[in-house]
């Protein structure tokens, strides 16, 4: 493929994961949500309080035409076999199974929770172009246990995969939990879905033992050309009898403000799932994706005993090599005095039984 066609297709495929939605036209009404103005909603679009917005269109062009993009292999196999999860994990135990990129299965308190599930081959609005996975999902879809909850952090294609949500609805009829506005998107593909939405600070109680908290993160959203930041993005805190899990799908570090706030509100975490890939070039990605050093600092700031690192090694969204996050993470852990065993760079199919406090 020549450079011009590569640019065209890769930019289309990155519409909602690395800046393509910067083409967005201004609108006087949100496509997804109508509600009162707040400290992070202007009546049409959501925003990061006190933070910088995503890079502009000229920055996108500069990056895509002039960036030094590493070539990923067509296959980057996981060292782990396909996982076959147990039906349920009860009580205070917490078991994490990594599906790939930003997709997790969390099992605790008898609940089976999927986060940002993606089983599709491409994280793109197109079946023929855009980021393509270089390893298969770590759990075969047919081997999933009964799924009770599906948490969707935001609407970028590498986190909200409509085809996967359709399959989950048919097979499991789960409850979907997602930030404001994303329910409208999900219903375009799964009209009969059970969905609960929330704003930052809201809580959804699930049964008698699990709560899902919506917390801020520094990011943005878009599915296409005219809906930039019209649906909210969020981190989640899963609170159960075994402690609290802090899950961030995507975030810029933003001086660690949200990590500080999470610890102040929730105390220390038994586990945090933190992104540490898709971060180059820094001049363009810094406001939306933290790098490995920032992820380690975030771990320390939020008081996480253990971290499952994600958002790397499955689909190429940005310029760094497929294994660059690993080397950068190892350096950051040494420089910041964190034991390597506490921050696990997850691979598809990997299973982690989280130690108790």
Residue ranges and their predicted role:
Residues 106, 116, 154, 212, ...:
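Divalent metal-coordination and catalytic microenvironments
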Residues 103-107, 205-269, 284-286, 290-294:
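Catalytic core of the metallo-beta-lactamase
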Residues 163-168, 189, 256-261:
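A short acidic, amphipathic alpha-helical/loop segment
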Residues 5-143, 179-247, 270-276, 328-350, 355:
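Metallo-beta-lactamase
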Residues 119-136, 220-227, 280-289:
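Acidic/histidine-rich helix-loop elements
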Residues 128-177, 265-273:
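Active-site metal-binding motif and surrounding structural segment of the metallo-beta-lactamase
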Residues 2-5, 9, 32-43, 47, ...:
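Cap/insert and terminal regions of metallo-dependent hydrolase folds
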């Amino acid at each position: 493929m020549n450079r011009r066609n590569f640019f065209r297709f890769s930019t289309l495929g990155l519409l909602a994961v690395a800046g393509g939605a910067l083409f967005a036209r201004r609108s006087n009404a949100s496509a997804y949500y109508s509600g009162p103005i707040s400290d992070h909603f202007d009546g049409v679009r959501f925003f990061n309080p006190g933070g910088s917005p995503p890079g502009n269109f000229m920055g996108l062009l500069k990056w895509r035409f002039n960036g030094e993009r590493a070539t990923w292999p067509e296959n980057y196999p996981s060292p782990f076999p396909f996982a076959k999860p147990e039906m349920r994990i009860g009580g205070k135990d917490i078991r994490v199974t990594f599906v790939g990129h930003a997709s997790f299965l969390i099992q605790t308190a008898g609940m089976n929770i999927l986060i940002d599930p993606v089983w599709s081959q491409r994280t793109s609005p197109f079946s023929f172009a855009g980021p393509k996975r270089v390893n298969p999902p770590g759990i075969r879809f047919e081997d999933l246990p009964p799924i009770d909850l599906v948490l969707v952090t935001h609407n970028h294609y590498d986190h909200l995969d409509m085809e996967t949500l359709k399959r989950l609805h048919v097979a499991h009829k789960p409850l979907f939990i997602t930030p404001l506005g994303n329910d409208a998107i999900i219903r375009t593909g799964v009209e009969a879905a059970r969905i609960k939405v929330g704003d930052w600070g809201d809580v959804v109680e699930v049964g008698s033992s699990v709560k899902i908290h919506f917390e801020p993160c520094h990011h943005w959203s878009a599915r296409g050309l005219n809906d930039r930041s019209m649906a909210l993005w969020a981190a989640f805190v899963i609170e159960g009898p075994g402690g609290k899990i802090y899950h961030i799908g995507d975030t810029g570090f933003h001086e660690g403000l949200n990590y500080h706030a999470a610890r102040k509100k929730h105390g220390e975490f038994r586990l945090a799932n933190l992104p540490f890939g898709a971060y180059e070039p820094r001049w363009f990605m810094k406001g939306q994706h933290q790098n490995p050093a920032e992820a380690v600092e975030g771990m320390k700031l939020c008081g996480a005993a253990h971290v499952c690192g994600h958002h790397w090694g499955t689909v190429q969204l940005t310029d760094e090599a497929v294994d660059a996050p690993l080397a950068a993470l190892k350096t950051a852990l040494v420089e910041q005095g964190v034991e390597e065993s506490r921050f696990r760079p997850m691979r598809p199919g990997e299973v982690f039984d989280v130690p108790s406090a």
